[in-house]
From Swiss-Prot:
Primary localization class, coarse: membrane
Annotated protein name in UniProt: Lipoprotein p35
Note: The dominant B-epitopes are found at the N- and C-terminal regions.
Coiled coil: none
Family classification: Belongs to the p35 lipoprotein family.
Membrane-related topology note: Lipid-anchor
Known function: Major M.penetrans antigen.
Organism of this sequence: Malacoplasma penetrans (strain HF-2) (Mycoplasma penetrans)
PROSITE patterns for this protein: PROKAR_LIPOPROTEIN
Domain of life: Bacteria
Amino acid sequence: MKIKKIKLLKALALTGAFGIVATVPVIVSSCSSTSENNGNGNGNGGTDGNTQQTEVTPAIKSEVSLTGALSKIYDTKTGTDRETTSQLIVKDIKANPENYFTNGEALKDVIASATVTVDGGFTESTFTGEAYSVWSAKADVKKGTYSQASKQLDIKSINDLQTVLGDSAAIKGICDLIPNLKLNNGTDYKVTNNGLSLSEDLLHINVTAKDGQTDVSMDLAIPVSDLNLKIDGLKISVSGTGIKTSELTTNYKFNIGIDNTVKTLTPAAVTLAEADRTNAEKVLEKLGYATVSGSTYTLDQDKLADALGLYNCKFEAVKSEKDSTNNNKYTVTLKATPNDGYFWEDGTNGAKEDISFVATFS
């Protein structure tokens, strides 16, 4: 298993590739010029010159719906070579015009060298308050991860989080689904403008509330796969040799995929009868990742997601196998299937059965 890389977020609007519906036909236009010489007085016949230059008119799709890694729309670098979201979308348009234009194949040879610009109305972040490293380190900050039971969020920019999460009642509903963030008498929930952070595919935001008369500060971690960049009326301008200068508009949606790399999980050693160690469900229950009622085991999906760093999937126990060199170590294998509406970074949504970790028994 790969170890999940840490990414840092500075703020910005939050491309892969699937999709898409469209309605505009392929358009190819020709420009001709003809010059004639009817003679030069020495008896030579006239010559006709005819040159023709063909240019392709881009036919934009009315809806562009893509799935891919966060890196397709957000550059985690912080230096001067960092690319904006607009620049990343332009790069994808040039590399994959078929995802944006009904005549993408006809454009492939000319759009790579064309001038393409994108205007999504992206704005600078308003999360300019106290830095994440400061507010999150305070001793009384409660930490929790956005529940799989909560909905995906469509945003035009990162600033939308202050509105799309909803009013106090809506944010309370989100927090009440997270054991660590549920308050006994919670009121006055709101998203602050304190700094954000992106770490291990989680976007951390600061939520405050009151528990009775006590002020509460929370670190709400939202999996990036819960975020969709949705721009109604994305403007695309195209010009260049062999391509008709065009000002185009489309409705753009980018579904950030699930990164299938996992964190290294090393749970503490537990006691379990040797005869039960090959029962993956019993092992998970013993480790605290499942509950049992009678003979029915229920996996704690949110707890497994946090432990593995793999979010918005349904986990199922597959097997538990003894290590060939250590009788007290067993490899527990799980199957992970993206929830409805979610995809892996490669755009697929089939199950992966190679999710595993080592359990140690004493």
